[in-house]
Structures are given as structure tokens and as C-alpha cells.
Amino acid sequence: MTTQFACSGIELELFRYPSQQASNLQAWDAADEHLVKYLIDTEITATTTAILNDNFGALTCALTMQYPHSELLVETDAKTSLLGYQQNLLHNKLASTNIHWLNSRETLPQNIQLVLMKLPKNLHYFGQQLARLSTVLPAGTQILIGAKAKSINPALLASIEKNLGPASASLAWKKTRVISCISDGKKRSLAKAVSWNVDELKLTISNLANVFAANKLDIGARIMLDNMPKGEFKHIIDLGCGNGILGLHAKQCYPNAQIHFVDDSDMAIASAKHNWQANELDTPSQDLQSQDPQTEQMPQAFFHWDDCLSNLPADVEPDLVICNPPFHQGEAITDHIAWQMFVDAHKRLKKGGLLHIVGNRHLAYHVKINRIFKNCTTVASNGKFVILQAIK
């Protein structure tokens, strides 16, 4: 893995976040380089530039170095990306005083003069981002989108025009292209969150645009729901919660428990919180109700936008961690997220606490869990998925 970013006279040392990742993964790709090269070659300048989907800060750091007095509005849905930006700015001794941090649900400011963005893997989310931009960008604003050349096709360009304005792609460079879009000034309405019913659980689930499994239960979650651990648990973490379906069902299985929903995606956390409230699950049982009517009832759900369990309050000692680990980080296929989840779960579980996870068979999670917990049991399996359990 190289950490030396060099493009159009800009030199940086960049790391993924967390930095202890597989040596074959780096913190930027050729599309980042192409965007920087295109911007400098065409001498486009702006006093206020919005940056969207910058994986670990290559664009943010490059523009901070090249245009130190310009205002940057940097938006991300991923906590690890935000932490990566801050890590790389600090490492390269770049000031962040000109940067305003935005999450993926905040109202965009009206003063944006230029937009740089990477094409995300989730095209539904991409369409929503473009529609959000249309609500604030005046006609004539330029949007530059970096992407792999193989990802660009007439349907994508038509989608950009539908959601924001006419678009065209540059010549290929290092197997990437830069899409240039000019805002047409028309405000689009934003799509509503997708909702559906899980009849067997009597739950209604709603997903914001960047949440995995947009309109149905994924297969891994379904087998997990059918195989929740036996026993009574008081403090449960739904790690990598997505829309919160596992944590919601945990409340049904263990009605007196406190549930902590944790995810790297801000939209996932917002979806999980909405689903908890929409299904009216925050109704404490008699055991959790205060004897004093003047005292606020103890909440049963807590929501954490976090890099695994890195910033979970120190007083949270779970006796159960349930987890459906992702094996993608953006475009990269990697097992470091699952590894970090298992390590963090082992650190935070109380003695005798249980890790209960579902994963694809081919990922061989049992090997990793055994290394950390010194035990691992197969609870259930089918042709594709396996449910594993380990005790601290």
C-alpha cells in the first residue's frame, strides 16, 4: 500500500481510517486524482466549494493545500470518513479552520459555487444527493463527479440530468472519467424514505437512502431474526445496526433490556431511531418504570453514530452484542470492519457476555472469533450463511 499522494504538484501522505488496515488498500483512488487534476488543469476556482463522498480526505486535503483561503463544505454519511478527514488534515499539518463539516441529512447552505463529489456505490443515495443539491444550487453552478470509467453509462448521465442538470463525461484517464454537470436551477422534491412491513414481527421498517437493503430484509438478517439467543439480557448492542431491525426484534425478545444501536452511517442511525419511535417500542416495562412519578423514565434505546464501539460511553457494559458485519467499505472488499467489530465486542462485553453474529460462510468468521474469544460455536446455518456465538 502506498500512502504518498502526488498529483498536479500536490503532495500528501494519506491513510485510511482506521490506519491499521489491509496493506493492499489505500486512502484514495484514481478518480480522486482525476478530479484534482481536472480542477487544476481547467483553472476552476470558487470561494465556496462543497465536497461530497470524499472517502478519507484526499479531496479535502488537496483543496485545503491548493486553495487555503477558500471555504470548504465537506459532507459525509460515514463516521470513519469524517475521522479519516480529520486524521489526514492533522497528519499533513493542514488547517481545518476553513472547513465546515456536514452530515448527510443536514440542510445544505445556499452559497455553494462549486461541487466536487465521488460517485458512491449506492446509486439511490447518489440520486438523493443530486436532488438535495438542486434545492440550493442556482442555475449555472458546476458539479464535478469523479468515477471509474466503467461505471459511467447513458443511464447514469440521464439520471444526473433528471435530478440536477445536463451532464457529460470527460475523456478517460487512468480508467476514470470526470462527469461535468451544470445545475439547471430547478428545485427537485426529495424522495421519501422507503417503508415496508415485516408482518411476522408486526414491525414497520423505514430506510433512508444510504441504508443497506433498501426495501426488504436481507437474507442474513432474516436468518438472524429466526435464531436470537436464548436467555435474559439487560444491556444489548446492535453493532452495525443498519435500519435497526435486529435491535427492534431484540426489544421484542428481551422486553426489559436497554438497546444500543451503533452504526458508521448517519442515515442508518437516523433510520433505526425513526423505526424505534414509529413502532412505539420505547415503553418501559414495570421493572424499568420509576417509582417516583416526577422522575423521568429510564430510556430503553440509545443511538450512536460511531466507528464500531470506539466512542461508546465507558459505563456501557453489554451482556449481548448482536452483529451482521459488512464486508465492504465503499468500493473496497475488506474484512477489517468485522475484525474490529469482534475486537471491540470482546473489549466491551462483561465477563460471561455473548457475541452473536451472522455472516457468509465463505468469510470464515469463526477463525477470527476463535482467535479473539478462544471459543466459537455454530448455532445455525444454511447453504450460504452461518450464525456464530462466542462467550467472553
UniProtKB/Swiss-Prot annotation:
Q: Does the keyword Chaperone apply?
A: no
Q: What is its EC number?
A: 2.1.1.174
Localization annotation = Cytoplasm
What is the first-listed, main subcellular location in coarse terms? cytoplasm
Q: Name one GO cellular component term.
A: cytoplasm
SUPFAM superfamilies listed in its UniProt record: S-adenosyl-L-methionine-dependent methyltransferases
Q: What is this protein called?
A: Ribosomal RNA large subunit methyltransferase G
